[in-house]
């Protein structure tokens, strides 16, 4: 319900403030803040118009650590996901439809360091890490290149090299559980929903 409300709010605002209308001047640049998921995060973004249809965006974000429980093969792990996790990158957005310029398709590349730290019932610790290069593909609505307030929503997929798991446990159980943990979390595919508010200038 919240996502639908945010999407409708962004869509309505952008429809009312189209950049071809006289009350909204064209803007070459903008600065934005955003929040995304599935893991809660906050980020900053600078946009520059290569043309009225094409935008290059430079972004940086950090995950908000959350306490999380994970059950894998009958073993419950407790800990924190998103600890000391951040990413940065560059996206290119293109507006292919002349009469619906709020709609855009986006592709990008960046680097990330994602971390999770968990303990099993026997006291063994596990560190999940997914780092290195990632790519993003998706589509969005809003963030037209206008001066003043800009709103937008984006949906897409992030692809990374996949996570690895390290453990301080020296027993066979700990090593086996680390392998199970890695197999369950090594896909490297992450859905992403992002809400953005910015200022064009």
Please state what every model-predicted region is.
Residues 11, 17, 29-31, 56, ...:
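Intrinsically disordered, low-complexity segments enriched in Ser/Pro/Gly/Ala and basic residues
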Residues 22-44, 55-63:
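Transmembrane beta-strand segments that form the barrel wall of outer-membrane beta-barrel proteins
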Residues 144-201:
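Predominantly the C-terminal beta-signal and adjacent terminal strand-loop region
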